[in-house]
Amino acid sequence: MTTRPAATRPDGGETLDAFYHGRVRVIQGKTGYRFSVDAPLLADFIRTREGDEALEIGTGSGIVALLLSVKPFKGVTALELQPGLAELARRNVALNGLRDRIEVVEGDLRTYEPGRAFDLVFSNPPYIKGATGFLSPSAEKSAAKHELHGTIGEILERTAGWLAPGGRACFVYPEK
């Protein structure tokens, strides 16, 4: 019998979800931040190419990068501001055996300097303006839904600077 290291197994406060008939597995908390339908929709929409170097802004649990793993690309740098979610994304990358293709970086998009350009930048960014509306008591959930640590304008500005010539960007963002 083979056992996985404890870090790649869900604990009592987590769930294990499977996609693509179990080819991609994702651990996420039962409460707090949980990815929505936007994540698989974004992953399906993104067209990758062999050799693509990609950057994900706000990876959360790593779900979009993980779902992209069934498509051709060289590597994804998955940027995440929140330490707990960055660690969860690392666990999910390890769980799926993707350390050679997905690197999770804990950092702030407003100060992140990758030192290279990317063929593709993608994100499922927060889209509720600042601290408007209902803020969840979960700081993790609020940061994922509200523009508390960067606006869409800042995300687009930074994306423009990170794209290689001919690069592409993909975002999930409401029409209004």
Describe every region a protein language model picked out.
Residues 75-80:
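Conserved SAM-binding motif I beta-strand of class I
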Residues 111-121:
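A short acidic, Gly/Pro-enriched loop at the edge of an enzyme's catalytic core
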Residues 125-154, 158:
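Mobile active-site "lid"/loop adjacent to the S-adenosyl-L-methionine
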Residues 149-176:
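Conserved Class I SAM-dependent methyltransferase catalytic core
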Residues 51-58:
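Conserved class I S-adenosyl-L-methionine
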Residues 7-49:
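Class I SAM-dependent transferase core
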Residues 61-74:
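Conserved SAM-binding loop of SAM-dependent methyltransferases across substrates and taxa
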Residues 89-90:
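Conserved SAM-binding loop
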